[in-house]
A protein has these predicted regions:
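Short, small-residue-enriched loops and turns at beta-alpha junctions
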Residues: 110, 138-141, 271-276, 302-303
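Residues that form or flank phosphate/diphosphate-binding pockets in enzymes
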Residues: 86-89, 174, 249-250, 275-276, ...
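Mobile, glycine- and charge-enriched loop segments
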Residues: 124, 259-265, 273-302
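Hard-cation-handling environments
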Residues: 140-265, 283, 289-291, 308, ...
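Internal alpha/beta domain cores that form substrate/cofactor-binding pockets in large enzymes
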Residues: 272-275, 295-324
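Active-site flanking residues adjacent to catalytic metal/cofactor-binding acidic residues
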Residues: 105, 133, 242, 266-267
Length: 324
C-alpha cells in the first residue's frame, strides 16, 4: 500500500502489529550475520514499524456508547467492535451518497465477547441498503460450539494428563481465557513460551483485565531454554500454551517425560494440518501434531455459524446482501 494512502486500525490491533514486527526485527538482529543483506532487512523492518505507528487509530468505545466516526473524503465510516479469533476486530457502517452499507468483516456470536453482536445490530444497523457479511462457514462447515464449552472440554482432559501442551494462537484473547479457566479448574500450573505469546498477553491484560472482571487477565509464567522452572514443572505437571513455531523447544522440554502422561490439545483450525495447500504453505501445525502420540482437538471457529449469519441478515433486513 503506498505511503500516501491513509490506513486505519483500532489501538489494540495496532499494538499487536507493533509487537509482532518489533519481535521480527529483534530476531533478524540476532540471527543474521552482519552483511549488506542484513542491513536491508533491518531497514525494511524499521520502515514497517514506522508505517504502523503512522496508522490512524481509534479507541474502542464503552458499551452502550456510539463509536466515533471518521471521514475519508465524503465517506463516513463508523467502527463497531465485535468478537473474532483475532483480537480487536470491528464491523463498519459506511455512509456515502445517501447509502448505508454495513460491512461485518469476520465475526461470531459464540465467544465471550459475542454477546454484544445482536444488540449492536438492533441499535445501529437500521435502514441498511447493502449488507456485506462473511460466509466462511458456509463453505467450510466449521464447528461452532461456545467458547465456554471449549474451556469445559479442556478442563476435563487436563485433569486426565499430568503434562498438557496447548497449541493456540497468541492473538486470540478469548481462547487464551478458555485455556486459563480450564487450567485453574484442573488445578494445573500455567506456563507459556514464545515472545509473541508473552507480549500479546501483556497487551490483553493491560487493556482488558479490569473491564472483563479478570477474565482477560493473563499471568502465565514464562518458560524458556534451560529455565530453572523446568524441574518444578516436570515434578508437578503443567499446562503450557505455545505457538506452532516452538516445536523444537517443546520437544526438548518433554524429553524424559512418560509419553503416556503427555497430551497435546490442538486448539486451532484443523485445515492447517488437513488441507494439502495449507500444509504446503506452512507444515508447522501438521508437524506439531505428529510429534505427540496423544492428541485431542478442542476448538471452535472464529467465524460466524450459518445460524448466526442468518440471524444477522434477519435483524439487519438489508435491501441487498453480499456474502464473502
Amino acid at each position: 500500500i503506498p505511503c500516501d494512502v491513509p490506513q486505519y486500525i483500532g489501538v489494540g490491533g495496532q499494538e499487536l502489529m507493533l509487537a509482532k514486527y518489533d519481535l521480527l526485527k529483534i530476531a533478524h538482529e540476532q540471527e543474521w550475520k552482519d552483511s549488506e543483506e542484513k542491513s536491508k532487512i533491518l531497514i525494511d523492518d524499521e520502515q514497517k514499524i514506522s508505517k504502523i505507528k503512522d496508522f490512524h487509530v481509534w479507541e474502542r468505545t464503552a458499551p452502550h456508547t456510539r463509536p466515533k466516526s471518521f471521514m475519508i473524503g465524503d465517506i463516513r465510516i463508523t467502527p463497531f467492535f465485535n468478537s473474532h479469533s483475532i483480537y480487536d476486530s470491528y464491523m463498519f457502517l459506511i455512509e456515502t451518497d445517501g447509502k448505508r452499507i454495513w460491512h461485518t468483516g469476520d465475526y461470531r456470536d459464540h465467544g465471550y465477547l459475542g454477546k454484544g453482536l445482536y444488540p449492536t445490530l438492533h441499535r445501529y444497523a437500521s435502514n441498511i441498503d447493502l449488507l456485506i457479511t462473511e460466509g466462511t462457514t458456509l463453505k467450510r462447515g466449521d464447528l461452532c460450539i461456545q467458547e465456554s464449552e471449549v474451556s469445559r472440554r479442556m478442563a476435563c482432559v487436563m485433569s486426565a494428563f499430568k503434562y498438557v501442551i496447548v497449541l493456540a494462537s497468541a492473538t486470540d484473547i478469548e481462547r487464551l481465557a478458555s485455556v486459563k479457566t480450564a487450567a485453574l479448574k484442573a488445578r494445573k500450573g500455567l506456563y507459556y513460551t514464545g515472545g509473541m505469546m508473552g507480549r500479546a498477553m501483556r497487551i490483553f491484560t493491560h487493556r482488558e483485565a479490569k473491564s472483563s472482571k479478570g477474565l482477560f487477565a493473563f499471568h502465565f509464567k514464562y518458560v524458556g531454554e534451560d529455565d530453572p522452572k523446568l524441574g518444578e514443572m516436570q515434578k508437578k505437571g503443567f499446562v503450557l500454551v505455545t505457538g506452532a513455531s516452538h516445536l523444537d523447544f517443546v520437544k526438548k522440554m518433554c524429553q524424559g517425560l512418560s509419553s503416556s502422561e503427555v497430551l497435546l490439545i490442538y486448539s486451532a483450525w484443523d485445515g492447517y494440518y488437513k488441507d494439502p495447500l495449507q500444509i504446503k504453505q506452512n507444515p508447522a501445525y501438521r508437524d506439531f501434531r505428529e510429534a505427540f502420540p496423544n492428541v485431542v482437538d478442542i476448538h471452535t471457529s472464529g467465524h460466524a455459524s450459518r445460524e448466526c449469519i442468518k440471524k444477522v441478515i434477519d435483524i439487519v433486513k438489508p435491501k441487498e446482501v453480499i456474502c464473502i
